[in-house]
Structure formats: structure tokens, C-alpha cells
Amino acid sequence: MPHHVSKARFAELVERAAATLPAQFASALAEVPIEIRDRPSTRMLRSLGLEDDELLLGLYHGRPRTERSVEDSGRLPDVIYIFQEDVELVSESEQDLIEQVRTTVLHELGHHFGMSEEDLDELGYG
């Protein structure tokens, strides 16, 4: 059964997860804000080849550090989206929710650093 919390509590869990990140990830949060949304938009899902009923826990929107160049100046800033309802759906308890939020934040920050899905799976952030 999904574990639901208030928007304020979920935001607190995201902040706590960000505060406990390994040093190499924590420094990136100054560059990449985290935005909490209830669910991904249809446009976001379609851009990933997903249907409306598929879950998406988080999304990194931007250009990974490994692909940047001087030509990138003036582009929109990177952002990480965390989708509260989908994270809650895969969490059966408060502890599950805490762990899933942290894993999702780490996963999306990994994309910021240029890591692939396979790289993240190997690190346990898949």
C-alpha cells in the first residue's frame, strides 16, 4: 500500500536527502535546483517514450556536465524534478519513502554528472 505524506513533509524529506548527499553530489545542488511536482506532465512522459499510466519518480532536465561547452551559455538552467505521487506509490512505509527520495535524488544528480542508467544501476541508484 502506498505511503502518502503531506506536501510539506515530502519537501522536508527531499531537503533531508539533499543534506545527506556524498560531497561530490552535494556541490552540484548549487547548480541544479530540485523542484517537487505531484506527477510528471504528459509532455515529460512522452519525451521519454512513457505512457500516462507509467511511473516516473524523477527527471533530470538539462545538459550533463560531461557534454557542456562554451556554446551552452545563455541556455535554460538545469533542474531536477521529483514526482511525489509516483515516489509515494512505490513506498510502503515512511522509511521506504525516505530511502526512495534519497535514491531518486542521487539518481537524477548522477545524470547531471553524465552517468547512464547502467552506471547508476551499478552504483545502486537505479
Model-based region annotation:
Residues Q100-E108:
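Short alpha-helical catalytic segment bearing the HExxH-like zincin motif
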Residues M1-Q100, H112, S116-D121:
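Active-site rim/adjacent substrate-binding subdomains
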Residues E122-G126:
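Short hydrophobic/aromatic patches at helix-to-coil boundaries
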